[in-house]
Amino acid sequence: MAERKASVERDTLETQIKASINLDGTGKARFNIGVPFLEHMLDQIARHGLIDLDIECKGDLHIDDHHTVEDVGITLGQAFAQAIGDKKGIRRYGHAYVPLDEALSRVVIDFSGRPGLQMHVPYTRATVGGFDVDLFQEFFQGFVNHALVSLHIDNLRGTNTHHQIETVFKAFGRALRMAVELDERMAGQMPSTKGVL
């Protein structure tokens, strides 16, 4: 089996990012981004998706976190698109429900080749530890646009904003793990009647 790894660099006037992933990893993670709450959530993707992630970013944090959070999502999406290759033999679809105390979220993903995001998270607070939670919409939109996936995110219940977000990222990691998993019964075939994704 060919290694499903990728390394991507993205340089703009706002951010300089290096991201490496291994879809068949063990959940190892290393981050140097400068946004602790984002790093905490990315760790959930690695751990629950069993995807090795290594991301470094120098961003214009003196302005705010917006460019950094969005551009990390973009770069991670680019890395996924590279690592997954032609998509032959993958399950393609993934889904997960994840609870954390009072919070429950559902994430469903399709590596369809068509970007689309439906995100419904009724945050109970605007910030967590000074982090603007609205920025996660920008993160996921950046990911979706560059990984070329259809992504549905629903927080079904929750009163603690940290818990709401953490269940989203844990479910996202688990849905990714399911979708990119190689299906032996597919025998390397394209998971689409069109023959292309």
From Swiss-Prot:
Pfam families for this protein: IGPD
Gene Ontology CC entries for this record: cytoplasm
SUPFAM superfamilies to which the protein is assigned, alphabetical: Ribosomal protein S5 domain 2-like
PROSITE patterns: IGP_DEHYDRATASE_1, IGP_DEHYDRATASE_2
Keywords assigned: Amino-acid biosynthesis, Cytoplasm, Histidine biosynthesis, Lyase
InterPro entries: IGPD_sf, ImidazoleglycerolP_deHydtase, ImidazoleglycerP_deHydtase_CS, Ribosomal_Su5_D2-typ_SF
Protein name according to UniProt: Imidazoleglycerol-phosphate dehydratase
